[in-house]
Amino acid sequence: MNYKEIMNSEYYYATYSRIAEIKKDYPVDHAFLHIRHVVTYAKKLAKIFKLSKHQQKLLYIACTLHDIGYLDGRENHAKSGSERAEIYLTKLNKLPKKDIEVIVSAIANHGGKEVLDFSEPVSMCLAIADKLDFVGSRYKNTNPKYDCSNYKKIVKNEFVLKDNKIQLTIFVKNGFNIEEFNTSHFGIKLKKFLDLLSL
């Protein structure tokens, strides 16, 4: 079993279609586009951190399932998602129990709120890949309640491992306001995450 099989499954389509519907008025995509972005970032991170082929397989499966907990709401979606993933993967009966445990642990810890969340390579790479997805294309919402104009000016980001630290470069369009970004909900969350990662 691999992540492409999951992405082509009825379960994946139905689950993320429902999440897209639930979060349609929310300014950030947590469905198909986000999952594709997270898998792409994870592939780069897997090379940077030299994950084995087996670890890569588990990482990409975790990426495809990491936000399924949004079916139960935003709060504790990582825990809920890990429980849903365990049920789904166990039912498929295509992976050994120890592999399912690695995937489920990565999903449970993808919030990256504690240093321990980075103790296992698959968990670490999923948490980082998830946080790196703040590019403008993810902000599709037109709900007037949210102003996403500054976020939409983020074109892409690139990252490398330098001196045992991730160096993040953000490419933006003219008019991007870094102060506004740094004091926004996501900017503050990203800074806390990067600070934790550098401990």
Sequence positions of predicted segments:
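Conserved, charge-rich beta-strand/loop surface module that forms ligand/interface-binding patches
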Residues: M1-S17, D130, E179-L199
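Acidic/His-rich, divalent-metal-binding segments that scaffold phosphate/diphosphate chemistry
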Residues: M1-N76
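Divalent metal-dependent catalytic cores for phosphoryl transfer on phosphate-bearing substrates
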Residues: F49-V160
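Terminal helices and disordered tails flanking the catalytic cores of nucleotide-processing hydrolases
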Residues: G136-L199
